[in-house]
UniProtKB/Swiss-Prot annotation:
Chief localization: cytoplasm
Protein name (database record): NADPH-dependent 7-cyano-7-deazaguanine reductase
Pfam families: QueF (PF14489)
Family of this protein: Belongs to the GTP cyclohydrolase I family. QueF type 1 subfamily.
GO cellular component, one term: cytoplasm
EC number(s) per entry: 1.7.1.13
Active site: 34, 41
Compartmental location: Cytoplasm
Gene3D superfamilies: 3.30.1130.10
NCBIfam families, per the entry: QueF-II
Organism: Anaeromyxobacter sp. (strain Fw109-5)
Length: 122
């Protein structure tokens, strides 16, 4: 497995696909670049999902998130891209991606992207 930034999300079989359960992850060191100013933007990315047949492998997720560090992108775009890419990789029953960005210009931005319907009782 690579040890440098990569957009390739690795997956593995869900060990309990018949049981709806939630997986939650947090990356407090996410960085991208403001496409307007060229300055770095810092965020905590929070993922919560209910897997179907596949799960996201953690090291590949770290390297995937790391791959945005030099990319110019708006908060809204990158949060939705992360959600879309994970949906493409694992087709979860439900997913929520929250981009909680550090204050910039006196404004604190939180972007939430969701896909699917959260199963009842999870």
């Amino acid at each position: 497995m690579p040890t440098k930034p990569a957009r390739d999300l690795q997956t593995f079989p869900n060990p309990k696909p018949d049981r709806p359960y939630e997986i939650a992850m947090e990356c407090p060191e996410f960085t991208c670049v403001c496409p307007v100013t060229g300055q770095p933007d810092f965020a905590t990315i929070r993922l919560r999902y209910v897997p179907a047949e596949r799960c996201v492998e953690l090291k590949s997720l770290k390297l995937y998130l790391w791959s945005f560090r030099d990319e110019g992108t708006f908060h809204e775009a990158v949060t939705n891209r992360i959600c879309d890419d994970i949906v493409q990789a694992i087709a979860p029953r439900w997913i929520e991606v929250v981009g909680d960005f550090a204050v910039r210009g006196g404004i604190h931005t939180v972007v939430t992207a969701r896909h699917g319907e959260r199963p009842a009782g999870v």
